[in-house]
Every structure is written in structure tokens, then in C-alpha cells.
């Protein structure tokens, strides 16, 4: 097992006693470095563990209960390059071994941004899906806004890592509508089909550039999250200023159609929010979202449980905000009045403190009701309470400029006994761990969280007894 790092992170920050006591997982990204390091850090800015990577991150890593991480990364030569480009996904053990690795960077698919680990061990993957200009025209698309003569659409693939098989897949191409060619199968009145996406909505990439040159990005899906209670998926589209909910209970056949699954709607949108002008039930004044990221459900049992929360990058006057809102859930579907847009008309909670970032950004509710917020371009993470008071913060610093796409904070008991009791992180519990813990307690040093075996917030003889019992089996 790797050596346990108890080092002060190069950071600026402060701590309030009301901050949630947890472990923050993050991977700084740098345009100057092709490799990267993932850190697991406590509230005192001490590294508890690190993982090293040969390639930089596409988004944030995910910590699993066995101590492994799922890490989406950037491949050197992607087949389509735009913001958030990735191409690779790997599972890395606590010890740093690569347990499996897959790349989705070919003439059909290019992974980008986020992934989502599922309870069954599978992984949901966001990909661009290549379509020729002619294929787009044949579906009713009127213009292609780039010189590449292609349109990279959107798909979600469910990977079964043990076999390498794609066991479920959703393609937006199966769920489009257009009102320009009545001879095509997807012809319809846009406002009568909020469950479908107007194929002529928005531009397809650009002909300019920046360092990545022209691209053919249409939807720019930048986040994905899964709700195991509902068996539903939510995704976020930066360019369309909307979030969408899909039914994951569908079979492989149902997901490509318009019926089936728990919702009875197949792979069509169950719900969408943020920009009703996209489906003809509003105008620019009705738009709430602008280039948003980090859509996710607040877990059941947390304050706001069942609501959705996101980071709205350009909320007002080029400043950002975190929004929490309650979707109008109705069984396995979502209520909507005929001719009107999906509700709600506004949010339930908003944080508009001194935050702004033009790219990525994160927002996650914590068990105690606080919210963890990532300001990407300054590599800054803050924790605020429900009143908007800032309780904890840090900024990652180093020899080069860093970003942090997003990060999450995990409870101290999330890893079970993986950290607890292993005082020297040598991969085994033995008498040496007892000696180290006893000496630290005698010295009044509680800096190593592995010593708090009963998670009562203190380290004393009870923790030594628990450690002895663990060693004796």
C-alpha cells in the first residue's frame, strides 16, 4: 500500500467548526502538465492519500467504497476536440494499480467530460457521436456551422467493465423533432413535443478556434448523474442551457423508441428545465440557465433530498450561482400543463456569493445541509451553509496554474476500516499501529484521522481497545 501522506496541502483557506468533517477528493488539472495527481484530503488540508496519473483529468474522479477511484482522463490525440475532451476511463486501486482501462476515442465515439459509476459496477459514459453533414441534413438539420462537414451528436453508453460490453445506450439522434420537412419521420410541431429535441436548435460547433481549432460540438453535455431510487439519469447541456432527465429502466430496444420503461416513454425526455424556448414554450426572458454544469440529485435523507442542484456559470452579469430546485415529479414521470413549460418557475435555494467561473464548476449538498462549491478556474473550493455563510475553503496552488473541475466530500466512514486503524498505512493492522496510536494519544496529537476508530470525534483508550480487537480478529 502506498505511504500515508500527512502533508499540508499548498493552499490558502480557513476552517469553521460548522464545516462538514469529511474527506475531499479532487484532481487539479494544468494545461502545462500532461500528468496529474488525485488527492484525498481532510478538513485540515492534510493529504490522506494520493493517486498518480499519466494523463490529465477530463473531469472529476469518483471514490468507491473499496478505496479505488474511477478516473476520466484526456487522451493525447482525440478524434473530436472541444472543451472537456477526455477519451479514457480507468479504475485505479487504493495502491495505484490500474484494475481496468478503456478508451472511447475513435471515428464513432469520443468520450468527454463526465462519467457516472452505477451501483452494479457499470459506468455511464458521455460521448460525442459522429454524424456526417449529410446524415444531419437527412434528419432535417438545416445548417452545419463548422468547416469540418460533420455534426458530433450526443450519446450515453453504459459500460460493463468486466466484459468490456456496452449493455445499454441512449442516442439523442433517436429522439429529435423538426418542423422544416414534412416528409421526414421526425417531422412535428416543436411545441407539441417537449419530450423530443429540436434538431435545428443551437449551432453545431464553430469555425474559429482557440487552441483546439474548429469543432463540431452540438449539445456539449458536461455532467451526468444517476438516481438509483428512480432509476433515472440527469444530464446537463451547456450550449443548450438545459438539463434533461431520462428513464434508465428501459430495455435496449425501448430506449431507442418512445414507449416502455417505468415511465412508459422509452428514451424520450421525461423532464427538461432551464430554457423552454428550445421547445417552443417560452422565449429568452424565460431562460433560467446559462452554460450550467454539475447537475445532480441531492441524496434522500439530506436537507433538500430529492431536489436537483447545479452550478449556473453565467447566472447574472457574468457571475455564477448555485441553484437548487424541485422538479414536479409525478410517479415515474414529471407533471407538465399542456402548452406550458416544465416547472418550477424558479429555484428553492440560491447561493450568489463571490463566485464566478467560465468553465465547469461544481455544487454538491452535504449530509449536514451545507453545500460544497467548486470555482474551477481559480482551483478554489468553498463550503457554505444554508444561509450562505462560508465555513471552509481552500485554493490549490503549485508551480503552474491549476484548475479543479469539480470535487466531492466523502464522510469519514465512507471507506470503512480502509483508513481507520492503519496508522502507518502499510496495508496491515498490527502491534506497530497500536504503538503509534498510543503514542499519539499520549502526546495529545489527533491529526491522524485513522486513530478515531469509533468515529466519535476524539482519540482515546476506546480507540486502542477497538484496534486491539480488530488485530485479534
Task: Mark where each language-model region is.
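Short, functionally important structural connectors and interaction interfaces within domains
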Residues: 4-7, 94, 162, 265, ...
Amino acid at each position: 500500500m502506498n505511504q500515508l501522506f500527512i502533508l499540508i496541502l499548498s493552499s490558502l483557506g480557513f476552517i469553521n467548526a460548522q464545516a462538514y468533517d469529511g474527506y475531499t477528493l479532487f484532481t487539479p488539472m494544468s494545461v502545462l502538465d500532461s500528468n496529474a495527481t488525485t488527492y484525498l484530503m481532510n478538513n485540515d488540508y492534510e493529504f490522506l492519500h494520493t493517486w498518480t496519473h499519466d494523463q490529465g483529468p477530463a473531469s472529476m474522479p469518483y471514490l468507491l467504497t473499496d478505496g479505488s477511484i474511477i478516473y476520466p482522463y484526456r487522451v493525447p490525440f482525440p478524434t473530436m476536440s472541444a472543451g472537456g475532451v477526455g477519451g479514457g476511463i480507468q479504475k485505479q486501486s487504493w495502491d495505484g494499480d490500474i484494475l481496468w482501462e478503456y478508451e472511447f476515442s475513435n471515428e464513432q465515439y469520443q468520450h468527454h467530460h463526465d462519467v457516472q459509476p452505477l451501483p452494479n459496477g457499470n459506468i455511464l459514459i458521455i460521448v460525442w457521436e459522429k454524424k456526417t453533414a449529410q446524415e444531419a441534413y437527412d434528419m432535417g438539420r438545416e445548417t452545419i456551422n463548422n468547416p469540418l462537414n460533420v455534426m458530433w451528436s450526443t450519446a450515453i453508453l453504459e459500460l460493463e467493465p468486466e466484459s468490456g460490453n456496452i449493455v445499454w445506450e441512449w442516442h439523442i439522434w433517436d429522439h429529435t423533432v423538426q418542423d422544416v420537412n414534412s416528409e421526414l419521420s421526425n417531422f412535428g410541431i416543436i411545441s407539441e413535443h417537449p419530450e423530443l429535441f429540436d434538431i435545428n436548435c443551437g449551432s453545431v460547433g464553430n469555425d474559429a478556434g482557440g487552441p483546439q481549432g474548429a469543432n463540431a460540438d452540438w449539445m456539449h453535455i458536461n455532467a451526468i448523474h444517476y438516481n438509483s431510487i428512480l432509476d433515472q439519469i440527469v444530464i446537463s447541456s451547456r450550449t443548450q442551457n438545459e438539463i434533461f432527465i431520462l428513464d434508465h429502466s428501459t430495455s435496449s430496444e425501448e430506449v431507442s423508441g418512445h414507449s416502455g420503461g417505468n415511465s412508459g416513454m422509452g428514451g424520450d425526455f421525461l423532464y427538461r428545465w432551464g430554457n423552454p424556448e428550445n421547445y417552443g414554450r417560452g422565449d429568452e426572458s424565460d431562460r433560467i440557465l446559462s452554460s450550467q454544469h454539475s447537475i445532480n440529485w441531492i441524496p434522500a435523507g439530506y436537507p433538500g433530498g430529492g431536489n436537483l442542484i447545479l452550478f449556473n456559470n453565467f447566472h447574472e452579469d457574468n457571475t455564477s450561482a448555485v441553484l437548487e430546485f424541485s422538479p414536479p415529479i409525478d410517479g415515474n414521470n414529471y407533471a407538465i400543463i399542456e402548452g406550458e413549460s416544465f416547472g418550477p418557475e424558479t429555484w428553492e435555494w440560491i447561493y450568489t456569493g463571490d463566485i464566478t467561473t467560465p468553465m465547469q464548476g461544481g455544487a454538491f449538498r452535504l449530509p449536514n445541509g451545507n453545500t460544497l462549491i467548486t470555482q474551477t478556474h481559480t482551483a478554489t473550493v468553498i463550503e457554505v451553509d444554508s444561509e450562505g455563510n462560508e465555513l471552509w475553503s481552500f485554493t490549490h496552488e503549485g508551480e503552474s496554474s491549476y484548475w479543479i473541475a469539480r470535487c466531492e466530500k466523502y464522510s469519514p466512514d465512507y471507506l470503512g476500516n480502509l483508513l481507520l486503524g492503519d496508522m502507518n498505512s502499510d496495508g496491515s493492522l498490527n502491534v506497530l499501529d497500536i504503538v503509534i496510536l498510543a503514542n499519539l494519544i499520549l502526546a495529545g496529537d489527533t491529526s491522524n484521522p485513522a486513530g478515531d476508530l469509533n468515529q466519535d470525534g476524539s482519540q482515546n483508550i476506546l480507540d486502542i481497545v477497538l484496534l486491539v480487537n480488530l488485530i485479534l480478529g
